[in-house]
C-alpha cells in the first residue's frame, strides 16, 4: 500500500512554460526560435519578481558585484527579510534555518550539518551563480517543506564564447600577518580494531594500537593575506553550449572570545578567554552542457570541497570544578558535495532528474584539558580522563525525479525524492600518555532513509487584470532513523505522513501597481539528526547536543498581503504584511536539569506559535549616476510553553538593509548597511534564562572600476568591526563576546 501511494503521487505529469516563439505560414517551413534569457541584471530580477505568481524577492550577480560578497551566504543578507547566522545559515522573516529550504537550479539541497537541518551557504561562491530568487509564498508546484523562504539559486548560463580569469587577495585587521596556530588532521588508522575487539584487548595490545595514532605537533607561523582565484570559459557551437568554471580560496580567521556563565545572578560558574584560529580552504567547479534545439536538454554539475582547520586555546577559571584552565582543542571539518542534474523540455513536457552526494568528515577532533587546582601554586597537568579524540563520518545520497505537463492553464505533476544517510563515530580518551580508552557508545551511530512522493494540480489563469494561481499539493513521506540505546538495544524512529497542502495566490495588476494576496499550508519535517538518539559534545559551545526521538513535524498556515509599485524601469516600492500560525513548531532548547558547566541542547515541539510582521522595500534611481535602496522587516512572534511566553528561537524583531550606489563613467561606488535585531540563540528553562544574540551594525564599502577587458574591485568589509555578543536578559550580562574583524579585499577580473 505504501509503495502504491508513492507511485500514485509520482504518476501525474507535470508542466513547463515554453520560451518558444513559433512562426508558421502556408508553404513555409516552421521556424522555432529558442532563447535562454539571462537574469543577471538588477532590472531583469525586478521584472522576474513582478511577473511571478508567488510573492518573492531576489538578487542578481550584477548587484552582488557591487558588494564585498564572495559567497551565497554573504549575498543572501542583502535580500529583504533575510538574515544570516555565522556567515552561512539562513533565517527568513525571522524563522530559523530549519524552516527554510534551498534549491540549486531544480534540485533540493541536502543539509550540510550533522547536528541541525541547515544548508551552509558559504559553500557556494557567488562567482558561479547568475541570480538568487527567494519565494515567500507557496504554490502547488513547489516543495512543501518550508515556511520562511524557498531559496532558489541559479548557476551561470552561457550565451556566447568567453574566457575569464579572476585573482584576488584579502586583508583582515585581526588575522593577517599575525601569529597563528594550526595542527594537521589525522586519518583514522585503517588497521585499527573494531570497538568490541579493542575493548577486549589487553593493555599491552592497547598500547600497540594506540601507537597507530599520530600526535602531530602544533604549527606556529605568521599568516599571509587571504588568496582566491578562478577561471571560467564558455563555448557556443550551433545548438550546443557549454560552461566550465572553477575557483579556489584560502582564508585565515582569528577570533578572540570571552566566554562565561553563572550559577546565580552574581556567582560565576566559569570564566574563559578563548583564541580561535580557523584556516579554510575551498575549491569549486561547475560544468554545464546545454542543447538548444526543437527540444532542450541540459546537464549541470557542481562539485564543491571545503576544509576547515580549527585550533583553539582556552585560558581561565572553572569555579564549578575549582580549577585554573589552560586547555586546547583542534578540529577539522571536510565537506564534499556533488550536485548533478539532467533536465529537458519536450513540447509541453518537462522533466528533471538529479543526484546529490554529501560527504562530511570530522577527522580527529581533539580536546586536551590542562588544569591545576584554583589558587594553588602547582604546575599544570593534563586531566587524562577528560581528554577527547573523536572521529566521525557522515554520507548522504539523494536521488530525485520530477515530470511536468501543462494542459493550457492547468498544470499537473509529480515527483519522487529518496535520501539515504549513514553516520558513524569513534570516541576515545587517554588513560595515560601511551594508552587510549574507547568510550564510543551504541548511540554514536545511526542510519536513516527518507522517501517522499509528491503530486500536484495547479491552475494558473488570468481574468483581465486579475491573475489566479491556485492548487493542491499532496506529499506522502516515509521517514526512518535507526540507532541504539546505551545497552545496545535497537531504537527505531519511524514516521509516516500524508499531507495535503492547498495554496492560493491572487494578484491584481495595473499598469504600474500590483496587489497580491496569498494563503497556503506548508510544513516543517524533523531532520534525521534531530530525532536520532545521539549526543555530541561541542567544546566550542561548551554543550552537548542530543536528538529527540519523540519530535514531530510542524504544520504551518501562511497568510501574505503585498502592494507593489514600479514607477520606472529598475525602480520598485513594496509593502508586505504576513502572518504564520505554527502547530507544534520545532525548536532547539536547553534541556531541563542542565547546569552552566554542562549544558544539554535538544529539540522540542511546543504546542503552538505565531509570527506576524511587515516588510518594506524601496529602490529609487535618483539620477543617472545615483540610486538608493532599502528594505526593512519588522516582526513579532510568540510561543507559549507551560504558561511562559517568549519569541520563537532565532526570530529577530527587525531586519534592516540599506545602500547607495554612485556610478560615473567606468566607476561604481557602493555603501551597504545591514542590521539585525536581537534574537534567541538558545531557549532556556526554569531558572536558566534564554540566551540572546545581540544586534550589531555592519557597514560595507565597495569601489568598482571597469577596465577595457575586465574590472577591478576594492572592498572594505564590516567597517565598524563590532563584536558579536550573547547575553541573558534577566542577568543583564554577556555570556559570550566574539570579536569581528574589518577586512579589505582587492579582486581583478579579466575577460580574455
Q: Where do the language-model regions lie?
A:
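N-terminal periplasmic "start-of-domain" segments of outer-membrane beta-barrel proteins
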Residues: 32-63, 97-100, 107, 112
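Transmembrane beta-barrel wall of Gram-negative outer-membrane proteins
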Residues: 212-312, 342-345, 504
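C-terminal beta-signal and adjacent terminal beta-strands/loops
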Residues: 628, 675-682, 703-752
Amino acid at each position: 500500500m505504501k509503495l502504491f501511494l508513492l507511485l500514485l503521487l509520482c504518476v501525474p505529469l507535470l508542466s513547463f512554460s515554453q520560451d518558444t516563439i513559433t512562426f508558421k505560414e502556408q508553404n513555409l517551413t516552421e521556424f522555432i526560435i529558442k532563447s535562454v534569457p539571462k537574469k543577471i541584471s538588477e532590472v531583469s530580477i525586478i521584472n522576474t519578481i513582478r511577473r511571478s505568481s508567488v510573492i518573492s524577492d531576489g538578487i542578481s550577480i550584477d548587484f552582488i558585484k557591487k558588494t564585498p560578497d564572495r559567497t551565497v551566504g554573504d549575498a543572501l543578507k542583502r535580500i529583504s527579510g533575510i538574515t544570516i547566522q555565522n556567515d552561512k545559515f539562513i533565517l527568513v522573516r525571522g524563522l530559523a534555518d530549519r524552516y527554510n529550504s534551498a534549491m540549486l537550479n531544480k534540485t533540493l539541497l541536502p543539509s550540510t550539518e550533522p547536528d541541525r537541518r541547515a544548508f551552509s551557504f558559504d559553500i557556494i561562491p557567488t562567482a558561479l551563480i547568475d541570480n538568487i530568487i527567494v519565494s515567500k509564498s507557496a504554490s502547488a508546484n513547489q516543495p512543501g517543506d518550508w515556511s520562511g523562504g524557498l531559496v532558489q539559486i541559479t548557476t551561470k548560463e552561457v550565451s556566447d564564447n568567453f574566457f575569464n580569469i579572476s585573482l584576488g587577495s584579502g586583508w583582515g585587521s585581526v588575522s593577517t600577518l599575525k601569529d597563528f596556530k594550526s595542527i594537521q588532521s589525522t586519518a583514522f588508522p585503517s588497521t585499527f580494531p573494531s570497538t568490541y575487539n579493542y575493548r577486549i584487548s589487553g593493555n599491552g595490545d592497547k598500547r600497540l594500537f594506540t601507537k597507530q595514532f599520530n600526535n602531530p605537533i602544533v604549527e606556529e607561523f605568521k599568516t599571509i593575506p587571504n588568496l582566491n582565484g578562478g577561471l571560467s570559459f564558455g563555448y557556443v557551437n550551433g545548438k550546443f553550449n557549454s560552461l566550465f568554471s572553477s575557483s579556489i580560496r584560502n582564508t585565515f580567521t582569528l577570533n578572540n572570545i570571552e566566554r562565561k556563565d553563572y550559577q546565580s545572578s552574581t556567582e560565576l560558574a566559569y570564566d574563559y578567554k578563548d583564541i580561535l584560529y580557523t584556516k579554510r580552504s575551498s575549491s569549486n567547479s561547475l560544468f554545464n552542457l546545454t542543447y538548444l534545439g526543437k527540444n532542450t536538454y541540459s546537464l549541470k554539475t557542481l562539485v564543491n570541497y571545503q576544509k576547515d582547520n580549527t585550533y583553539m586555546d582556552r585560558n581561565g577559571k572553572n569555579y564549578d570544578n575549582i580549577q585554573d584552565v589552560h586547555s586546547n582543542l583542534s578540529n577539522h571539518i571536510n565537506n564534499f558535495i556533488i550536485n548533478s542534474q539532467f533536465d529537458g523540455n519536450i513540447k509541453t513536457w518537462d522533466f528533471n532528474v538529479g543526484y546529490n552526494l554529501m560527504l562530511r568528515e570530522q577527522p580527529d577532533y581533539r580536546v586536551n584539558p590542562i588544569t591545576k587546582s584554583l589558587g594553588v601554586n602547582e604546575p599544570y597537568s593534563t586531566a587524562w580522563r577528560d581528554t577527547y579524540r573523536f572521529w566521525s563520518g557522515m554520507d548522504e545520497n539523494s536521488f530525485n525525479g520530477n515530470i511536468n505537463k501543462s494542459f493550457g492553464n492547468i498544470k499537473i505533476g509529480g515527483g519522487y525524492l529518496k535520501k539515504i544517510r549513514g553516520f558513524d563515530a569513534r570516541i576515545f580518551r587517554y588513560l595515560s600518555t601511551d594508552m587510549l580508552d574507547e568510550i564510543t557508545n551504541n548511540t554514536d551511530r545511526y542510519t536513516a532513509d527518507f522517501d517522499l512522493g509528491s503530486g500536484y494540480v495547479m491552475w494558473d489563469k488570468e481574468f483581465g487584470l486579475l491573475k489566479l494561481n491556485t492548487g493542491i499539493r499532496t506529499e506522502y513521506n516515509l521517514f526512518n532513523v535507526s540507532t541504539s540505546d546505551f545497552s545496545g538495544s535497537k531504537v527505531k524512529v519511524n514516521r509516516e505522513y500524508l499531507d495535503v497542502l492547498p495554496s492560493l495566490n491572487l494578484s491584481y495588476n495595473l499598469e504600474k501597481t500590483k496587489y497580491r494576496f496569498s494563503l497556503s499550508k506548508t510544513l516543517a519535517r524533523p531532520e534525521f539528526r534531530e530525532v536520532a538518539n545521539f549526543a555530541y559534545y561541542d567544546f566550542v559551545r561548551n554543550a552537548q547536543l542530543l536528538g529527540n526521538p519523540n519530535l514531530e513535524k510542524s504544520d504551518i498556515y501562511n497568510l501574505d498581503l503585498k502592494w507593489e509599485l514600479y514607477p520606472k524601469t529598475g525602480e520598485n516600492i513594496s509593502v508586505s504584511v504576513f502572518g504564520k500560525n505554527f502547530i507544534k513548531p520545532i525548536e532547539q532548547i536547553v534541556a531541563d536539569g542542565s547546569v552552566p558547566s554542562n549544558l544539554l541542547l535538544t529539540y522540542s515541539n511546543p504546542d503552538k506559535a505565531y509570527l506576524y510582521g511587515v516588510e518594506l522595500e524601496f529602490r529609487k534611481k535618483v539620477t543617472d549616476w545615483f540610486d538608493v535602496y532599502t528594505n526593512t522587516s519588522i516582526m513579532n512572534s510568540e510561543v507559549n510553553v507551560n504558561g511562559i511566553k517568549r519569541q520563537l528561537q532565532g526570530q529577530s524583531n527587525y531586519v534592516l538593509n540599506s545602500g547607495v550606489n554612485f556610478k560615473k563613467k567606468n566607476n561604481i561606488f557602493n555603501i551597504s548597511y545591514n542590521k539585525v535585531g536581537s534574537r534567541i540563540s538558545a531557549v532556556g528553562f526554569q531558572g536558566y534564562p534564554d540566551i540572546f544574540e545581540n544586534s550589531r551594525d555592519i557597514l560595507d564599502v565597495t569601489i568598482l572600476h571597469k577596465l577595457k577587458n575586465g574590472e577591478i574591485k576594492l572592498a572594505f568589509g564590516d567597517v565598524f568591526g563590532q563584536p558579536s555578543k550573547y547575553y541573558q536578559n534577566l542577568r543583564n550580562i554577556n555570556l559570550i563576546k566574539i570579536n569581528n574583524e574589518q577586512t579589505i579585499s582587492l579582486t581583478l577580473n579579466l575577460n580574455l
